[in-house]
């Protein structure tokens, strides 16, 4: 019998309800006493049920019965084991999360391969509820599994990455139908692989819910595998992660041992340089003749990253209220994808013009005349510039650096900052779009940090690390405000001169 069935509670009709003081259940019939049937508490608050509906800003109750989610509990009020406490917390977090989804008219979580399977939560409380579900579910798994076996299985997760790369190389995702399924023999024939090889690869992916097997010997898409069909750039992002990042991470321990486990510097060997047998950094390798396809794939991968926040960034900061000459300088901004989004949303009121600087701006722009035309229409000018060199544009209203600093170790970041500060006027603003990692970092931020570290010697920084970085560059730099959004895992640091 399922846990849900074991702990299903009976409900009785009553015009009087109570609210559990521990927040386990929102509405419970009193049934003649004031004891909460979920937690056993006698301190429940009575309230008269009303037939009139009202609008509330708090999450609505889920449409399913609350009784179905009564937590595991001991009605005698004996101390609960930690395992049971975590289980109760998980059930409450799921209920809370469902309420937020319903309030924002978002679909319920599912593994079905719908293009819009997971909507974007706009309220931070909903994001926090979702994060709580994930964290508590992972904790339950860790507590449930044998610790020796759990550690061993965790140490073998790199095999999932290699299996995913094989599937992408074979374009398996393109041959599995969005609806319905395909047999292993049919799929093997379409991708040009031995059926036995394909079966073993798919077995590893299905463990992580990338594809599924509705019946033995058949495969179908899940929400995760369908993500590979939604955007060609997303495939390039996975390709980059499963190639350069994967290989760099495999040698990161060796690279750290060579520098005696200290913070990396620009000249230090990195996991990437050891994996690729070079003394050059990532950017230098991508500039070599013969590495054009790798460089193009990386550019497409970064375009996929940009798309995740492209519509969010213009709303994160009041660009229409910037002071001074109204000039925004997008330092290291590629060909202007983000700058165009900002100018398209805010040009005219405060923000008047934009210069996008990039080390390869001129060469790359010549190959994409449509991009040049789009920039021209929005008042975006391209300028060839290396951010380690003196900043040629003086006294601009805003110097905007997006996803720059996490690519570099501290000493290199100080150089970039010093060149920028030298050009700033007294009213100039330095806007840095990067992560400000919480002290208890999310899994995403933690893994991004290791990714930046092994590839570039870079890092994701918390607030105190950002403040130390600014002090090292110029004592006058201070954080005026940190702008955040629930819609994307990115942050905007507004930095000024005192």
UniProtKB/Swiss-Prot annotation:
Coiled coil: none annotated. Transmembrane segments: none annotated. It holds the Pfam family Methyltransf_2. O-methyltransferase; part of the gene cluster that mediates the biosynthesis of a tyrosine-derived cytochalasan acting as a fungal signal recognized by resistant rice plants and leads to avirulence in Pi33 resistant rice cultivars. The first step in the pathway is catalyzed by the hybrid PKS-NRPS ACE1, assisted by the enoyl reductase RAP1, that are responsible for fusion of the tyrosine precursor and the polyketide backbone. This is O-methyltransferase OME1. Residues 1-23, 42-83 are annotated as: Disordered. S-adenosyl-L-methionine binds at residue 358. Residues 1-19 have a biased composition (Polar residues). Induction: Expressed exclusively during fungal penetration of host leaves, the time point at which plant defense reactions are triggered. Its EC number is 2.1.1.-. GO terms for molecular function: O-methyltransferase activity; protein dimerization activity. Belongs to the class I-like SAM-binding methyltransferase superfamily. Cation-independent O-methyltransferase family. Keywords: Methyltransferase, S-adenosyl-L-methionine, Transferase. GO terms for biological process: methylation; secondary metabolite biosynthetic process. Pathway: Secondary metabolite biosynthesis. It comes from the Eukaryota. It comes from Pyricularia oryzae (strain 70-15 / ATCC MYA-4617 / FGSC 8958) (Rice blast fungus). InterPro entries: COMT-like, O_MeTrfase_dom, Plant_O-MeTrfase_dimerisation, SAM-dependent_MTases_sf, WH-like_DNA-bd_sf, WH_DNA-bd_sf. The lineage of its organism: Eukaryota, Fungi, Dikarya, Ascomycota, Pezizomycotina. The active site is at 406 (proton acceptor). It is an enzyme of class 2 (transferase). SUPFAM superfamilies: S-adenosyl-L-methionine-dependent methyltransferases, Winged helix' DNA-binding domain. Residues 50-65 have a biased composition (Low complexity).
